[in-house]
Amino acid sequence: MLEKYEILKDYKGPFDIKNYDYETLQKLAQEVRDYIINVTSKNGGHVGPSLGVVELTIALLRVFNPPEDVIVWDIGHQGYPWKILTDRKEQFPTLRQYKGISGFLRREESIYDAFGAGHSSTSISAALGFRIGKDLKGEKEDYVIAVIGDGALTAGMAYEALNNAGHIRPDRFIVILNDNEMSISPNVGAISTYLNRIISGHFVQETRQKIKNFLQHFGETPLRIMKLTEEFLKGLISPGVIFEELGFNYIGPIDGHDIKALEDTLNNVKDIKGPVLLHVYTKKGKGYKPAEENPVKWHGVAPYKVESGEIIKKSSPPTWTSVFGKALVELAERDEKIVAITPAMREGSGLVEFAKRFPDRFFDVGIAEQHACTFAAGLAAEGLRPVAAYYSTFLQRAYDQVIHDVALQNLPVTFAIDRAGLVGDDGPTHHGVFDLSYLRCVPNMVVCAPKDEQELRDLLYTGIYSGKPFALRYPRGAAYGVPTEGFKKIEIGTWEELLEGEDCVILAVGYPVYQALRAAEKLYKEGIRVGVVNARFVKPMDEKMLRDLANRYDTFITVEDNTVVGGFGSGVLEFFAREGIMKRVINLGVPDRFIEHGKQDILRNLVGIDAEGIEKAVRDALKGGRLI
């Protein structure tokens, strides 16, 4: 694939960028974009964010010297040009593939990836840690740069870091705000560009410092007057006053697609005393028309046709997400007290139709998972029926609020937890494999998982009207194709015995239930009679059924798409221990390690929670063999 690119095919690494002329750099930028489009059209991925930072990546590599100079990219959505232009040009076609390179930045993958991430708004905190660490080690000549998107600045953690950095005021510490939505009212005219060049120049900065040094002899009042005058004048033309108030030297906004302007400005700000915030504006999806026209859709996509931008869709049942979204709309039509909250996941959580139909009852709070949870708690306290839609991996960020603001007060918030279990290509930063463990230990919390589409609808209905903190978790991707109609309440804490057996019984939660049935069906043909139970409630468990099963079976196999540490299987063992019941219990689930990226079916097979893995576990258990 690389042979088609005149510049990129012979490109060796960041040192080449420092020697290219601007015409060559422009060609390189175009080739990098084309390469990203070609690879992501086959593999899927975060197209829009990466296409928007090609020139910025080139400028950073031209001005700075990583890995000695540390560059921290927020989340990693913008990381594809970085991977290509550092040391993964040849490996880029394996992007997001099993055993290939990650869709995010990973320290294990390259010396250029200073800090890994998959969740937003961590870059400034991490970069500040690098900066202070270098200062303490005497490495004061190195630079530390954080690159963060404007969307990530909706999260409180970013402002906590800005506030701390503004207080410490380290030198050679630069935060680059990649504004690809222009949500911070950029002023990008000729006057702003000219003034920006002046403000960032060495002469103005040196003169500014000399004036401050002189005024210090006359006390604080003249310095304060100077600062207020500066802020007033800059506030007329600049959106950066808030950053100045936090203690940063604000520069910008500048064109994030002008390599020379970026290079000149970066060189100018390198020696400004104290922390610098450089505001650059970019176009999400630049260079690919479909992505430019619909940046939300093209933030992250499945494989697509390059010519048309049409997403390649395989024939499959409805997704768990779409089943949830449709059910919530139906329930909201009946009950005006139902409201929906999401932290910047309207599309991903299946709430687009809800937002259209009930705009006054839909709240996208931005990347603010903690606020979303406590906001939902307040709505519940006022008598509404809030449904807070999270990805499992992001609910982790609101754990204190789940405990302190919802569960402790026993407020009826329904948590719709999408992307539970192994999510696939996005890998360990996005797998939702901890929620059963961290939720089942919380008092007052109901925790459940549906086996299929109809049960998802019924459990959602049950949760909304339960009057309790209620967590409903379901996986990413296509469901099983089970027909759906209506809603019915399910008694909380009840399980469902789907198949009676003799030799052993499988207790499965959520997605693995049908996998257990498939395994049992195959074993039945060989005369091995295995029971299967849909253990849909992880908390409270069906203790009555567990006692009954203990009278009929000696071997229990628990299956969950969650870590085995503290998960559903642990709960079964805890119950038997409390009751003094001695049984052999084998726990299948995600082992105590971070699972890599890859297709869901590959990963589920890897950890042994698909039909094949469950069948093997039964055979090993019945012959007394050890599970691996």
From Swiss-Prot:
Keywords: Isoprene biosynthesis, Magnesium, Metal-binding, Thiamine biosynthesis, Thiamine pyrophosphate, Transferase. Gene3D superfamilies: 3.40.50.920, 3.40.50.970. It catalyses: D-glyceraldehyde 3-phosphate + pyruvate + H(+) = 1-deoxy-D-xylulose 5-phosphate + CO2. Its EC number is 2.2.1.7. GO terms for cellular component: cytosol. One of its GO terms (molecular function) is thiamine pyrophosphate binding. GO terms for biological process: 1-deoxy-D-xylulose 5-phosphate biosynthetic process; isopentenyl diphosphate biosynthetic process, methylerythritol 4-phosphate pathway; terpenoid biosynthetic process; thiamine biosynthetic process. Its cofactor is Mg(2+); thiamine diphosphate. It comes from the Bacteria. The keyword Nucleotide-binding does not apply. Binds 1 Mg(2+) ion per subunit. Binds 1 thiamine pyrophosphate per subunit. It is an enzyme of class 2 (transferase). Thiamine diphosphate binds at H77, G118, H119, S120, G151, A152, N180, Y288, E369. CDD domains: TPP_DXS (cd02007), TPP_PYR_DXS_TK_like (cd07033). Pfam families: DXP_synthase_N, Transket_pyr, Transketolase_C. Pathway: Metabolic intermediate biosynthesis; 1-deoxy-D-xylulose 5-phosphate biosynthesis; 1-deoxy-D-xylulose 5-phosphate from D-glyceraldehyde 3-phosphate and pyruvate: step 1/1. Mg(2+) binds at D150, N180. Disulfide bonds: none annotated. The keyword Thylakoid does not apply. Homodimer. Belongs to the transketolase family. DXPS subfamily. Catalyzes the acyloin condensation reaction between C atoms 2 and 3 of pyruvate and glyceraldehyde 3-phosphate to yield 1-deoxy-D-xylulose-5-phosphate (DXP). This is 1-deoxy-D-xylulose-5-phosphate synthase. The gene is dxs.
